[in-house]
C-alpha cells in the first residue's frame, strides 16, 4: 500500500489547449514532478543544467571565434586574398594606367595637363558613383550612381585647389561627350522592341509622345519669358527636358516587376517600352531644333532645313542599317565583334560627320534608325552585341556625367538665373505629371496605377547629360558669345533637372510602387506568374 501511495499516475487525456503530448513533453513532466517530490524548485538551476548550458555556450561561441580568426588569417595571408587583394589590384591598375599614359605623353599626364585631367575626372566619377551606391535605404531602390558621378565632376570644377590642377580642353570634353552620346543612341536603337510596340500600341504611343511634347512646349514658353531665350533655343531646352531617363526608370521597374507589383496590368513593361520611344522623340526634336537654331536665312528656309536634316538622317540610317544587317554574314568568324565594331564605328562617324557637313541634327537620328534596323535583322542575336556595347557604356558613363558636372561653375552662375532655372524645371515637371495622368486615362488602369505612372514618368538623367551640352559645344564652335550664353543656360537647366528629379523620381517609384500597384500572389512555389498586358487601346 505504501508503494501504491507513492506511485504517480498521469492521465492520458489531451490538454484543454488542444495540443498533443509528445514523448519528450511527457518525459519533461516526469522529471519536473520528481524534482518537486525531492523538494527542488523546477526553475532553480541544478549543477547538471549549469554544466550543460555552459558547454552549449562554448559550442556556440567557438565557431564565431573561429570565423573571426579565419577571416583575419585570410586578410593577412601571403599572398593576400579577399578585400586586401582587391584593394591592391585596383590601386595597381589605377597607378599603372596613369604611368602608361605618362610614359607616352609626358607633361600632358602631369598636373595641369589635359590627359591628367581626364584620368582624374574618370577616377573621381567612378568613386563618386560607388560611394552613392553605398547609401541604401530599406524597401527603397538604390540611388542612381550617375548622381554621384555628376556631383564628383561638379566638385572638381568648383574646388579651387583641384580645379587649378585638373584642366580639360573644350575640344576633348566635347568629343568625349559626343562619343558617349553615340553609345546611348545605339543602345536606344537596339533596345527598341517592335513586339512590345505592337502589343501596347495606343497607350504606349500616347505615353511616349504626349508628355514629351507638352513638356517641351511648356519649357519653351517658360524659357522664352523667364530666361529670355529665343524661341528656337526655348524649344532646344524644351526637348532636352522632355526625355525621361531609362537609367533611373528601368532598374526601378525591374525591382517592382521582380516583386510582382503591377505585373498583371503590365505597368513595368509599359514604362520600359515607352521610355525608349520617349527618348527618341526628344532627341529627334532636339536635333531638328538645333539645326534650325544655327541656320542662317529666313524662318521658312530654317524650317525646311530642319525637315531636310530629318530626311537625310532617316535615309542614311536606313541604308546603313540594311547594310549591317547582311555584312558581315552569319558564316563569318567573330561575328559579334565585327557587328559591334561596325555599329559603334558608324554611329560615331555619323554624329561627328553631321556636324562637319553642317547638318548637326541628322547624325543622332541616323544612328537611331541604323541601330533599330540592324537589331531587327539580327533578331535574338543582337543580345550579344548589346552586352559589348553595355561594357563601352560602363566606360563612358563616368566620363559623360563627370564632364557634365565639370561644366557647371558656381562662380559663373547668377542666383536669379538659378532660381529661374529651378522654376522652369519645377513648372515643366508639374505639367508633365498632369499630362501623363491624362494620357493613361481610358487605358484599363485604376486610379492608383494612374497616379503611380504619372510620378514614375518624372526622372531625368541620361538624355539630359548626353544632349544638354551639345548646344553649348555647337555655340562654341561658332565663336559667338551670345550663343554661348544661351547654351550655358540650357546646360544649367539640364544639370539642375538631373540633380532634382533623378533622386526624387527614384525614391517616389520605390515608395509608391508597393503601395499603389497590385501585387501578384504566388500560390505555389513552382508556379510562375507571368504578367500579361491587359491594356485597352
Swiss-Prot record:
Q: How is its activity regulated?
A: Allosterically inhibited by the N-terminal domain. Inhibited by phloretin.
Database matches in InterPro entries = Cation/H_exchanger_TM, CPA1_transporter, Na+/solute_symporter_sf
Q: Spell out the subcellular localization from the entry.
A: Cell membrane; Mitochondrion membrane; Endosome membrane; Recycling endosome membrane
Map out region (Disordered) in residue numbers: 1-28
Where Phosphoserine occurs along the chain? 49
Q: Which domain of life is it from?
A: Eukaryota
Mutation effect (residue 58 to A)? Does not affect tNa(+) Li(+)/H(+) antiporter activity
First-listed, main subcellular location of the protein, grouped into a coarse class: membrane
Name the tissues where it is expressed: Widely expressed. High levels detected in the distal tubules of the kidney nephron. Detected in red blood cells (at protein level).
GO CC annotations? apical plasma membrane; basolateral plasma membrane; mitochondrial inner membrane; mitochondrial membrane; mitochondrion; plasma membrane; recycling endosome; recycling endosome membrane
Question: Which loops or segments lie on the Cytoplasmic side of the membrane, by the record?
Answer: 1-86, 134-144, 190-200, 243-270, 325-339, 374-390, 441-461, 510-537
Q: What is the effect of changing residue 278 to G?
A: Abolishes Na(+) Li(+)/H(+) antiporter activity. Does not affect plasma membrane localization
Purpose of the protein: Electroneutral Na(+) Li(+)/H(+) antiporter that extrudes Na(+) or Li(+) in exchange for external protons across the membrane. Uses the proton gradient/membrane potential to extrude sodium. Contributes to the regulation of intracellular pH and sodium homeostasis. Also able to mediate Na(+)/Li(+) antiporter activity in kidney. May play a physiological role in renal tubular function and blood pressure homeostasis. Plays an important role for insulin secretion and clathrin-mediated endocytosis in beta-cells. Involved in sperm motility and fertility.
Q: What miscellaneous comment appears in this entry?
A: The subcellular localization of SLC9B2 remains controversial. Was initially thought to partially localize to mitochondria. However SLC9B2 does not seem to contain a mitochondrial targeting sequence. It was later established that its localizes predominantly in plasma membrane or intracellularly to endosomes and lysosomes. In another recent study, endogenous SLC9B2 in the distal tubular cell line mpkDCT4 is detected in recycling endosomes but absent in plasma membrane.
Q: What is this protein called?
A: Sodium/hydrogen exchanger 9B2
Which species is this UniProt entry from? Homo sapiens (Human)
Amino acid at each position: 500500500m505504501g508503494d501504491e501511495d507513492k506511485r504517480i499516475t498521469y492521465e492520458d487525456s489531451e490538454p484543454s489547449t488542444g495540443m498533443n503530448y509528445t514523448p519528450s513533453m511527457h518525459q519533461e513532466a516526469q522529471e519536473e514532478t520528481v524534482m518537486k517530490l525531492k523538494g527542488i524548485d523546477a526553475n532553480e538551476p541544478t549543477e547538471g543544467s549549469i554544466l550543460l548550458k555552459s558547454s552549449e555556450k562554448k559550442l556556440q561561441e567557438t565557431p564565431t571565434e573561429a570565423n573571426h580568426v579565419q577571416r583575419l588569417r585570410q586578410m593577412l595571408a601571403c599572398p593576400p586574398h579577399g578585400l586586401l587583394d582587391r584593394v591592391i589590384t585596383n590601386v595597381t591598375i589605377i597607378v599603372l594606367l596613369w604611368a602608361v599614359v605618362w610614359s607616352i605623353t609626358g607633361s600632358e599626364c602631369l598636373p595641369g595637363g589635359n590627359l591628367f585631367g581626364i584620368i582624374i575626372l574618370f577616377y573621381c566619377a567612378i568613386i563618386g558613383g560607388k560611394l552613392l551606391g553605398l547609401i541604401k535605404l530599406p524597401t527603397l531602390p538604390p540611388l542612381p550612381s550617375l548622381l554621384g558621378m555628376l556631383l564628383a565632376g561638379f566638385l572638381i570644377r568648383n574646388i579651387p585647389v583641384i580645379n587649378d590642377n585638373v584642366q580639360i580642353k573644350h575640344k576633348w570634353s566635347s568629343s568625349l561627350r559626343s562619343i558617349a552620346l553615340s553609345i546611348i543612341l545605339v543602345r536606344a536603337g537596339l533596345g527598341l522592341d517592335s513586339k512590345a510596340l505592337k502589343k501596347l500600341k495606343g497607350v504606349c504611343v500616347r505615353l511616349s509622345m504626349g508628355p514629351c511634347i507638352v513638356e517641351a512646349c511648356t519649357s519653351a514658353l517658360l524659357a522664352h519669358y523667364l530666361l529670355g531665350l529665343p524661341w528656337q533655343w526655348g524649344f532646344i531646352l524644351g526637348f532636352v527636358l522632355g526625355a525621361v531617363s531609362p537609367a533611373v526608370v528601368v532598374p526601378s521597374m525591374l525591382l517592382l516587376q521582380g516583386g510582382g507589383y503591377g505585373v498583371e496590368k503590365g505597368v513595368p513593361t509599359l514604362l520600359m517600352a515607352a521610355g525608349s520611344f520617349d527618348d527618341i522623340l526628344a532627341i529627334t526634336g532636339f536635333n531638328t531644333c538645333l539645326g534650325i537654331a544655327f541656320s542662317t536665312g529666313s524662318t521658312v528656309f530654317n524650317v525646311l532645313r530642319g525637315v531636310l536634316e530629318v530626311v537625310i538622317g532617316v535615309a542614311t540610317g536606313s541604308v546603313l542599317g540594311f547594310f549591317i544587317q547582311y555584312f558581315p554574314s552569319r558564316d563569318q568568324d567573330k561575328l559579334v565583334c565585327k557587328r559591334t565594331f561596325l555599329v559603334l564605328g558608324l554611329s560615331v562617324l555619323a554624329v561627328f560627320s553631321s556636324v562637319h557637313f553642317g547638318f548637326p541634327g541628322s547624325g543622332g537620328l541616323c544612328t537611331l534608325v541604323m541601330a533599330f534596323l540592324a537589331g531587327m535583322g539580327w533578331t535574338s542575336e543582337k543580345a550579344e552585341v548589346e552586352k559589348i556595347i553595355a561594357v563601352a557604356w560602363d566606360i563612358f558613363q563616368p566620363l559623360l556625367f563627370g564632364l557634365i558636372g565639370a561644366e557647371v561653375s558656381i562662380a559663373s552662375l547668377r542666383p536669379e538665373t538659378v532660381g529661374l532655372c529651378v522654376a522652369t524645371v519645377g513648372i515643366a515637371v508639374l505639367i508633365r505629371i498632369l499630362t501623363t495622368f491624362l494620357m493613361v486615362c481610358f487605358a484599363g488602369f485604376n486610379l492608383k496605377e494612374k497616379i503611380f505612372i504619372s510620378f514614375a514618368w518624372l526622372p531625368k538623367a541620361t538624355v539630359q547629360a548626353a544632349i544638354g551640352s551639345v548646344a553649348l559645344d555647337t555655340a562654341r564652335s561658332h565663336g559667338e558669345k551670345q550663343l554661348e550664353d544661351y547654351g550655358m543656360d540650357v546646360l544649367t537647366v539640364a544639370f539642375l533637372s538631373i540633380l532634382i528629379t533623378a533622386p526624387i523620381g527614384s525614391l517616389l517609384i520605390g515608395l509608391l510602387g508597393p503601395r499603389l500597384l497590385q501585387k501578384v500572389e504566388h500560390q505555389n512555389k513552382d508556379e510562375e506568374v507571368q504578367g500579361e498586358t491587359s491594356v485597352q487601346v
